[in-house]
Design a protein with these regions (language model features):
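Amphipathic alpha-helical dimerization/coiled-coil segments
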Residues: 7, 23-26, 31, 108-142
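Charged, amphipathic alpha-helical coiled-coil/dimerization segments
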Residues: 71-131
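N-terminal leader segment of winged-helix/HTH proteins
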Residues: 1-35
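Generic structural concept
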Residues: 9, 13, 37, 41, ...
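N-terminal helix-turn-helix DNA-binding core of bacterial DNA-binding proteins
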Residues: 23-65, 76-78
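Short, hydrophobic-biased segments on the C-terminal half of alpha helices
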Residues: 52, 70-71
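Alpha-helical structural segments
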Residues: 18, 45-46, 57-58, 105, ...
């Protein structure tokens, strides 16, 4: 790793972690769910039904940890569990209307906060962020 990459990595890490914490504080009080639980709901919202194993892999956690998260979300009425269509041993997780509403409300609240902050930036700064967003997504998926 070059010195320039190390400095960039440190700066990005600090900025991304601070922004993550700030966005985490903008949760919907009606749906007081952990960041991990909201990530699971968001994944189901984007991708549709998934198995516990697929969710665990996607969130980079162990299946037993995902099973605990799914148990809480099921008890809260945010998701349903059903046997797989082709393999009845598989458990498929799907969003309920309550889960979908939680995702939508959470995104609206966080997007509103972020949109307000973006309004304080110059056009040039917003253009830089617009260009950086897909690159940051690529880093997150690596």
């Amino acid at each position: 790793m070059t010195l320039a990459n190390a400095e960039l990595a440190a700066g990005l890490r600090v900025a991304v972690m601070r922004l993550r914490r700030r966005l985490a504080n903008e949760h919907d009080p009606e749906h007081d769910l952990s960041i991990g639980a909201m990530a699971v709901l968001g994944g189901l919202y984007r991708l549709g039904e998934l198995t516990v194993g697929e969710l665990a892999e996607r969130e980079r956690v162990r299946p037993p940890s995902m099973t605990r998260t799914i148990k809480c979300l099921t008890e809260g009425g945010y998701v349903t569990r059903a046997a797989g269509e082709y393999d009845r041993r598989q458990v498929v997780i799907a969003l309920t209307d309550r889960g979908r509403s939680a995702v939508i409300a959470d995104r609206r609240r966080r997007d509103a906060w972020l949109s307000e902050r973006l309004g304080d930036l110059s056009i040039e700064e917003r253009d830089v962020l617009r260009a950086a967003a897909p690159i940051l997504e690529k880093l997150a998926e690596a």
